[in-house]
Amino acid sequence: MQYMFLIYSEPGAGPEMGSDEHQAEMQQWFAYTAALGEAGVLVRGDALHGTEAATTVRVRDGGALHTDGPFAETKEALGGYYLVDVPTLDDALAWAAKVPNAGYGSIEVRPVVDFSQG
């Protein structure tokens, strides 16, 4: 079954960009992604630009409204995702607990609906 890991953290949480700690964490991300791939469970994963690069679209009264930034102010921002294919929720949760920023952020795990199954 496929599961989406939605990776959240507070803006500014974690190591400072460019620091030795940041470089070390990036190596953890690369190793984690490689481990998912080597285990044959990685479908896809990407980092996202920050909320300052986001645009929200709402359609109201037949017209599209575009707003810079996310729809609502949030304490934690979505920073990326992984899509994995594993047998059980327990397997997904075990992999999610290993996401490098799980120690200062949060990982939301959601099963993906498979409409091809009828």
Protein language model annotation of sequence segments:
Residues 1-118:
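Conserved, structured core segments of small domains
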